[in-house]
């Protein structure tokens, strides 16, 4: 019994030693010492000011902060480190001579959050240069020689919050990076000061939210003087935005090769800036934004009657959306007034006042009024044209009259206006004279110079003897005579 018990104990001892050796072999890994000319403190590796031409090899995998500033590095290749530094969150490469960075240089450091490339010799930011840094929050590129910035250089950098590009030679920056909220959604600071910018998309800049404009630095650029530029910066000054308030003296523009401060009203002769109110018509749908200088703030709206808008206003048309904006379903006249937005954050509070003017008519009804007035005006013009056509273009009946025969040499003529109830008949045309009504009534008018008014003779004048005419022939009226309607002597023929 005793030998078997000893044998069993021996086997247990050997098994324990084997398991111990296996665990040691599995957990064992090469220990990397601190590189030469570097200072290691826990997970911080400092190799600054060592005149290094290349990055030290065999960097410890636990490194969280790597300082390579103030050296002689000129190129950052894809294989600059053979070790994948997944714990590295800060990389300092400032004050070197870097003029080339590979598009795959940041693949070994996918969790980098802070990258300092300032004070180098970079000229171009190529396409997808920083696209592998999806966790990067701060990028320093100031004091380089950057001229060209590709619009896709900062692709897939959803966590980027601060981008420093001052003291370069940039003449055009792709501002669509900040206009499109999906490109760099968390960007709160963009420093483009001390560059070569001459023109700005002023209309697009006005539409940016206040928290973007608050961190958009544009001072010390040779901007072209313009009243719209003054209006833009005056609005930022009115809102107390840091990008203007901190550098008012450095905001200048160029006119006739001379520098002028943007706020020089005497020189610009620009109208003074006044904050405009929101305008709406009856029945309009309107959304008023609480344009705060910081993101993620809690917003509370107060109506002109000093009532807090919780979910729905007193008249049932005003609500507050999830993003803190004031929404009007159908604007009413009583909705007009000054609304106040109280924004509260962890370290900053802000109060905004917005005036709403409501016009007491619908926009559609206003167009109907204009259409009615236009139709009335057109109708009046057409009426005047028709009257003018009737007066000046109506055919004259005298055009259709035949040429009258001249009167006889005695001047005897029968000037009459025939008034008859039946058509004229020739009495000698045959048939019985009693078969039809052939009685004519005429008012004779004096034809000669010896007659006075109403057929009476003037003193000293004689009535001329008329010349006999053929049987059945009518006398021609004298064209020089007056119409017989003024005669008072009826004659039955």
From Swiss-Prot:
SUPFAM superfamilies for this protein: Immunoglobulin, L domain-like
Parts of the chain on the Extracellular side: 28-372
Transmembrane segments: 373-393
Residues carrying a glycan: 72, 269, 315, 349, 360
Residues making up the signal peptide according to the UniProt record: 1-27
Swiss-Prot/TrEMBL GO biological process terms: axonal fasciculation; axonogenesis; brain development; cell adhesion; cellular response to L-glutamate; heterophilic cell-cell adhesion via plasma membrane cell adhesion molecules; homophilic cell adhesion via plasma membrane adhesion molecules; myelination
Renumbered residue ranges of the record's region Disordered: 405-493
Listed Basic and acidic residues bias regions: 431-442
SMART domains linked: IG (SM00409), IGc2 (SM00408), LRR_TYP (SM00369), LRRCT (SM00082)
Main location per the UniProt record: membrane
Phosphoserine carried by residues: 477, 481
Taxonomy, superkingdom: Eukaryota
GO cellular component, one term: pericellular basket
Protein's recorded name: Amphoterin-induced protein 1
Name of the gene encoding the protein in the UniProt record: Amigo1
């Amino acid at each position: 019994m005793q030998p078997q018990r000893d044998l069993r104990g021996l086997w247990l001892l050997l098994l324990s030693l084997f398991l111990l050796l296996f665990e040691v072999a599995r957990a064992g890994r090469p220990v990397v010492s601190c590189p030469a000319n570097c200072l290691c403190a826990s997970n911080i590796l400092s190799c600054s000011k060592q005149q290094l031409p290349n990055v030290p090899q065999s960097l410890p995998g636990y490194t969280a902060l790597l300082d390579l500033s103030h050296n002689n590095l000129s190129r950052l290749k894809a294989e600059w480190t053979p070790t994948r530094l997944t714990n590295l969150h800060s990389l300092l490469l400032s004050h070197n001579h870097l003029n080339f960075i590979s598009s795959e240089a940041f693949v070994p450091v996918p969790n980098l959050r802070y990258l300092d490339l300032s004070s180098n010799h970079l000229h171009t930011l190529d396409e997808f240069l920083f696209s592998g840094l999806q966790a990067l929050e701060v990028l320093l590129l100031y004091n380089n020689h950057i001229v060209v910035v590709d619009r896709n250089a900062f692709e897939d950098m959803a966590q980027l919050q601060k981008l420093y590009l001052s003291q370069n030679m940039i003449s055009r920056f792709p501002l669509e990076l900040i206009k499109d909220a999906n490109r760099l959604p968390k960007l709160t600071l963009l420093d483009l000061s001390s560059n070569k910018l001459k023109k700005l998309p002023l209309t697009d800049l006005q539409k940016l939210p206040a928290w973007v404009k608050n961190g958009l630095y544009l001072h010390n650029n040779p901007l072209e003087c313009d009243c719209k530029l003054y209006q833009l910066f005056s609005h930022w000054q009115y809102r107390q935005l840091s990008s203007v308030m901190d550098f008012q003296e450095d905001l200048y523009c160029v006119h006739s090769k001379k520098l002028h401060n943007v706020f020089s009203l005497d020189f610009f002769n620009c109208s003074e800036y006044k904050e405009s109110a929101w305008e709406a018509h009856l029945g309009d749908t309107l959304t008023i934004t609480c344009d705060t200088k910081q993101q993620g703030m809690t917003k509370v709206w107060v109506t002109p009657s000093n009532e807090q808008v919780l979910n729905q206003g007193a008249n049932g048309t005003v609500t507050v959306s999830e993003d803190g904006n004031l929404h009007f379903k159908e604007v009413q006249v009583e909705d007009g007034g000054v609304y106040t937005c109280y924004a509260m954050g962890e370290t900053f509070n802000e109060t905004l006042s917005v005036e709403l003017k409501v016009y007491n008519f619908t926009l559609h009804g206003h167009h109907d009024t204009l259409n009615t007035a236009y139709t009335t005006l057109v109708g009046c013009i057409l009426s005047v044209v028709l009257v003018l056509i009737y007066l000046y273009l109506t055919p004259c009946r005298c055009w259709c009259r035949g040429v009258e025969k001249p009167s006889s040499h005695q001047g005897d003529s029968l000037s009459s206006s025939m008034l008859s109830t039946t058509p004229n008949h020739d009495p000698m045309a045959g048939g019985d004279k009693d078969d039809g009504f052939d009685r004519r009534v005429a008012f004779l008018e004096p034809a000669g110079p010896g007659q006075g008014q109403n057929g009476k003779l003037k003193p000293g004048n004689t009535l001329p003897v008329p010349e006999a005419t053929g049987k059945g022939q009518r006398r021609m009226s004298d064209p020089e005579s007056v119409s017989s309607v003024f005669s008072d002597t009826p004659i039955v023929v």
